[in-house]
Amino acid sequence: TIDDFNFKCCIGKNGISKKKREGDKKTPAGTFEIENLYYRPDRIKKPPTKLKCIKIKKNMGWCNDIRFPKKYNKLIKIEKNIKYEKLNRKDYKYDLLIPIKYNSKKPIIGLGSCIFIHLTKDYKPTAGCVALKEKDFLIMLKLIKKSTKIKIF
């Protein structure tokens, strides 16, 4: 809910948890800051928003590799030997993407990574993210700013 808008969304396949762990398919419970908007300029024009907008490039990933503590749960340039979530996906889900600042300031290895607000068409459960239909995502973008927080409960 933002102002008077209620948005239907989908969450992690295994529900919401205060004890989120890497790969558990749970959405973390709590109140979190949000990051910048990442978008696919080859598919969507830059949407109106007060968030900083970053174009997704082919070499962009989000590190989920517990072997690399300095890169874990951060935006990275894709490297061969590092596990990552590719931002430039073949499907539509990351055409619009906002990272949720969960386990991000001083990431604890294994506590979970790659928690995003992204797109869905069918409300199928996610691997731990929050997903909205594109029309709702675009409305949300007009209402939020850098100081907006997401409450997951």
Describe the role of every protein-language-model region:
Residues 1-127, 134-153:
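Cell wall/extracellular polymer interaction/catalysis modules
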